[in-house]
Swiss-Prot record:
Source organism (scientific name): Arabidopsis thaliana
Segments in the Cytoplasmic topological domain: 1-4
GO BP term, pick one: methylation
Ranges of the Lumenal topological domain: 26-589
Protein name stated in the entry: Probable methyltransferase PMT23
Family: Belongs to the methyltransferase superfamily.
Highest taxon of source: Eukaryota
Compartment(s) of residence: Golgi apparatus membrane
Cross-referenced InterPro entries: Put_SAM_MeTrfase, SAM-dependent_MTases_sf
GO CC field: endosome; Golgi apparatus; Golgi cis cisterna; Golgi membrane; trans-Golgi network
């Protein structure tokens, strides 16, 4: 029977349509088909922060419309450009917002070193430094790093007489010197031990805050004594010192005591250290020292090594007398004051463990804070009042390390002992059975870790025996558990993941997210969060996500557009690994 040409055409078209349909529903990009919705259908803006925001002048040419995705997130729809600007290699969005900084009415209180986040957050990618290499592995990195990874010659020149850092061939070498470490940091730490033998590193002193830390040699030295130090300094006070610290594998963050509280909970640190940290403690009615008092635990120590302690000229004597009056007004007592054979001196203060001294002061100046403090110190102004001490027997806390890792503070309202025990057991089993055995992570290359939704710090506690450290982040829209993290002898910060982190690019080997990123889509675009993750993670580093499959599929597509390699495990875990790919530089016209 003859078949007409029309029948043949219809048959061929039908066959082609069936083949196309089969391909669409079996291809990788269609494994998890979603309704075609724009990000604007599930995006609601983040509430305005108290800090004025301005659009940053380091950006790509792309418009917000080019970056919008539908929820199917097909890789081909995402186009990335390099950030523009001479400083884009080391760009930190919330600290490099020059347009906002130019509009500040005052810089007297270091306002220009505080956070001023751009709106919208940039979605461009940062270029790599020329000749960037995988970092020197730990522990060798504590003593030397690749110069090409952090090519900042000014600090080397500026601090060459103080033995902070030297350039030797392809490397930057850290001899362990410093402004106050004339005989080296090891000698300086021993000097502290002799000055106050009751300081037992790695036992009653586990969590330390180093103010104005330089290249963090003090904190790096204490790692050998089972002490973890949160080292901080403002950006560019000396060129890239915090970047050097993190490249070395030493815990550090960018921060400043300016007009706002530090992003740490109250009563957190066992010891605070300042060696010529250039903070005027008596400024603005003593607010900077009152902030240290807030984050120092009852019975904790403050070590101050600066010229007013051991020199007698008019200027230093005036500063010392002001410090005497201020510390007396907040009931800190001097437990020792001494000078080393190097000519460097220090004084060690101790915070009281009871409020009896507060009530006996002849004048209530500074006054006690009249309201219960919220631990969440995110964009909270500095207060000119004296923080009340926690209730209960604070003299018995904390437990000696490492027992405190699994202990709960008496009268704790943040967590009960049984809750912490179950959380610890859950994370211990998950890390040993899944993270270390089955996920595509080479843990021998991992040193700097950030847990994006840390909870009680269970993930960090489960990794405690590995040669790495964890920055535990408690999101500001989650339950406030950061005080528990510090009680356990771990470190961390508050943060809003709809904004950029106070850290340099390429500073973490692994970011971990447990059921965080899916919730964030209610407040900000997941694309901007992934762009921030790409900024933070080093080439060769990892993103490990535990979440629902919908979130994992979205992330897999976005990471694919960034040329990250990805693997999914048991439909619950996604491991992404960053490569060296960057978008092509725009052609000069």
């Amino acid at each position: 029977m003859a078949i007409s040409v029309q029948h043949v055409v219809v048959l061929l078209l039908s066959t082609l349509l069936i083949a196309i349909t089969f391909f669409l529903f079996t291809s990788d990009n269609a494994r998890f088909p979603f309704p075609s919705l724009s990000t604007t259908d599930y995006y609601t803006p983040i509430p305005k922060s108290p800090i004025p925001h301005r659009i940053v002048d380091v950006s790509s040419d792309q418009t917000p419309q080019k970056m919008k995705l539908n929820t199917s997130l097909e890789v081909g729809e995402l186009k990335w450009d390099l950030c523009k600007g001479a400083e884009s290699v080391d760009y930190i969005p919330c600290l490099d917002n020059y347009a906002a900084i130019k509009q500040l009415k005052s810089r007297r209180h270091m306002e220009h070193r505080e956070r001023h986040c751009p709106e919208p957050s940039p979605k461009c990618l940062l270029p790599l430094p020329d000749n960037y290499k995988p970092p020197v592995p730990w522990p060798k990195s504590r003593d030397m790093i690749w110069y090409d990874n952090v090519p900042h010659p000014k600090l080397v020149e500026y601090k060459k007489e103080q033995n902070w850092v030297k350039k030797e061939g392809e490397f930057l070498v850290f001899p362990g010197g410093g402004t106050q470490f004339k005989f080296g940091v090891t000698h300086y730490v021993e000097f502290i031990e002799k000055a106050l033998p009751s300081i037992k590193w790695g036992k009653n002193i586990r969590v330390v805050l180093d103010v104005g830390c330089g290249v963090a040699s003090f904190g790096g030295s204490l790692l050998d004594k089972d002490v973890i130090t949160m080292s901080f300094a403002p950006k560019d006070e000396h060129e890239a010192q915090i970047q050097f610290a993190l490249e070395r594998g030493i815990p550090a963050t960018l921060s400043v005591i300016g007009t706002q509280q530090l992003t740490f909970p109250s009563n957190a640190f066992d010891l605070i250290h300042c060696a010529r940290c250039r903070v005027h403690w008596d400024a603005d009615g003593g607010k900077p020292l009152l902030e240290l008092n807030r984050v120092l635990r009852p019975g904790g120590f403050f070590i101050w090594s600066a010229t007013p302690v051991y020199r007698d000229n008019d200027r230093d004597s005036r500063i010392w007398n002001e410090m005497v009056s201020l510390t007396k007004s907040i009931c800190w007592k001097v437990v020792t004051k001494t000078v080393d054979s190097s000519g460097i001196g220090l004084v060690i203060y101790q915070k009281p463990t009871s409020e009896s001294c507060y009530n006996k002061r002849s004048t209530q100046d500074p006054p006690l804070c009249d309201k219960k403090e919220a631990n969440g110190s995110w964009y909270v102004p500095l207060a000119k009042c004296l923080s009340k001490l926690p209730s209960g027997n604070v003299q018995s806390w904390p437990e000696l390390w490492p027992k405190r890792l699994v202990s709960v503070k008496p009268q704790s309202i943040s967590v009960k002992a049984e809750t912490l025990k179950k959380d610890t057991e859950k994370w211990s089993a998950s890390v040993s059975d899944v993270y270390l055995k089955h996920l595509a992570v080479n843990w021998s290359t991992v040193r700097n870790v950030m847990d994006m939704n840390a909870g009680f710090g269970g993930f960090a506690a489960a990794l405690i025996n590995l040669p790495l450290w964890v920055m535990n982040v408690v999101p500001v829209d989650k339950p406030d558990t950061l005080s528990v993290v510090y009680d356990r002898g771990l470190i961390g910060v508050y943060h809003d993941w709809c904004e950029s982190v106070n850290t340099y690019p390429r500073t973490y080997d692994l970011l971990h997210s447990s059921f965080l990123l899916g919730d964030l889509t209610q407040r900000c675009e997941i694309v901007q969060v992934v762009a921030e993750i790409d900024r933070i993670v080093r080439p060769g580093g990892y993103l490990v996500v535990q979440d629902n499959m919908e979130t994992i599929m979205k992330l897999e597509s976005i990471l694919g557009s960034l040329h990250w390699s990805t693997k999914i495990y048991e439909d619950r875990f996604l491991v992404g690994r960053k490569g060296f790919w960057r978008p092509a530089k725009p052609e000069l016209r």
